[in-house]
Amino acid sequence: MKAMLNPSRADCIAILSAASRIVDHTTLLDLNYKNLGLSRNGMETAASFLIERACFTRHREVDGLTAVGALSLQGRMRLDQLANN
């Protein structure tokens, strides 16, 4: 994935919110832009941005498809910051 500089706040919140529902640290959430209600470019940009900032306990990128694990402490803090500001 190729990241742009400024992902949408709403796109970041959508991905972080979806990942916040993961309780098992071995589970990965396949990111699907249609299921998240995002544009493909918006989802890819936000996912790259969040992965680069270590917002997930783990992630996987295979054949252009991205999956993320539960939120890391950084991810929980970023979600709280984005949702409350």
Regions found by a protein language model. Name each.
Residues 9-13, 44, 73:
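Non-catalytic, well-ordered alpha-helical scaffold segments
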Residues 71-85:
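Short, amphipathic alpha-helical interaction segments positioned at domain boundaries
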Residues 15-18, 46, 78:
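Charge-rich, solvent-exposed alpha-helical interaction surfaces
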Residues 63-71:
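Minor-groove-contacting beta-hairpin "wing" of winged helix-turn-helix DNA-binding domains
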Residues 6, 36-53:
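Short amphipathic alpha-helical interaction segments
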Residues 4-36:
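Short amphipathic alpha-helical interface segments
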Residues 35, 62-63:
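A short beta-turn/loop motif at secondary-structure boundaries
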Residues 51-62:
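A short, conserved structural fragment
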